[in-house]
From Swiss-Prot:
It is a multi-pass membrane protein. Forms homooligomers and/or heterooligomers. The chain crosses the membrane at residues 9-29, 46-66, 69-89, 101-121, 131-151, 165-185, 189-209. It is found in: Cell membrane. One of its GO terms (cellular component) is membrane. GO terms for biological process: carbohydrate transport. This is Putative bidirectional sugar transporter SWEET7d. Keywords: Cell membrane, Membrane, Repeat, Sugar transport, Transmembrane, Transmembrane helix, Transport. Mediates both low-affinity uptake and efflux of sugar across the plasma membrane. The keyword Cell membrane applies. The lineage of its organism: Eukaryota, Viridiplantae, Streptophyta, Embryophyta, Tracheophyta. Residues 218-274 are annotated as: Disordered.
């Protein structure tokens, strides 16, 4: 009774952490919506996650593996979230990407239909059904958890953790640890293997982060004063007026010139009158 209670608590915590992981690409898709263009983003990982969620939902059903409701809930939520992501991606993709997505989605649907029919018609016990679907879950779960290996190799080559966010690595580690613990309380090898590998890969990311954090180029600070505020203000101040006489205006200059020109004529007129 106590192990079951602990297992349920751990499973609920795992649901919460996994939900956070499913929501982590939201900023990416918000950017796609704002730009109305997928640009260089790829839908591959979301298509893979969709298939992975479908397999785990099927695995957790009572007709396949009883007492796995917490596996069904989180992967059912993940299935809906991934479907929303792919819908957004489809709406803002070009014809080539839409065609590719359509082919992959149709293939995944046919694959799941074949798995469901094959398991339900051929395997007549929970143990055999769990074995078949569990092996498929391990294969696709391992592929998904090993996807950060490409990013890790990039970190080693560039000696920079710029494209490996610390928070995502920490949450991935906690998620794998939580679900591994869940699987060990009532031993389930099919949940243990992919999540145990997830813990290992996330731990490797954290180690790499600790090694290469100091060698990562720092981004220019955007929290300092506005660039205009750093411009040196002019020290010029108007000088006080000169004690000399003020300059004549154009009007007074013209008046003075006219008076000077008239003075000889006035002198001659005065001489005649005399």
């Amino acid at each position: 009774m106590v192990p079951d209670l602990i297992r349920n608590v751990v499973g609920i915590v795992g649901n919460v952490i996994s939900f956070g992981l499913f929501l982590s690409p939201v900023p990416t898709f918000w950017r796609i919506i704002k730009n109305k263009d997928v640009r260089d983003f790829k839908a591959d990982q979301y298509l893979a996650t969709l298939l992975n969620c479908m397999l785990w939902v099927f695995y957790g059903l009572p007709i396949v593996h009883p007492n796995s409701i917490l596996v069904v809930t989180i992967n059912g939520i993940g299935l809906v979230i991934e479907a929303v992501y792919l819908t957004i991606f489809f709406l803002f993709s070009d014809k080539k990407n839409k065609k590719k997505m359509g082919v992959v989605l149709a293939t995944e649907a046919l694959f799941m239909a074949a798995v469901a029919l094959g398991v339900l018609l051929d395997a007549h016990t929970h143990q055999r059904r769990s074995l078949i679907v569990g092996i498929l879950c391990v294969i696709f779960g391992t592929i998904m958890y090993s996807s950060p290996l490409t990013i890790m190799s990039q970190v080693v080559k560039t000696k920079s953790v710029e494209y490996m966010p610390l928070l995502l690595s920490v949450v991935s580690f906690l998620n794998g640890l939580c679900w591994t613990s869940y699987a060990l309380i009532r031993f389930d090898i099919f949940i243990t293997i992919p999540n145990g590998l997830g813990v290992l890969f996330a731990l490797m990311q954290l180690i790499l982060y600790a090694i290469y954090y100091r060698t990562t180029p720092k981004k220019p600070s955007t929290t300092g004063p506005h660039p205009r505020s750093r411009i040196r203000t002019s020290s010029y101040q108007p000088s006080p007026p000169s004690p000399r006489a003020p300059a004549s205006s154009p009007l007074s200059a013209r008046t003075t010139t006219s008076m000077a020109a008239m003075s000889p004529s006035i002198s001659r007129l005065s001489h005649k009158l005399a």
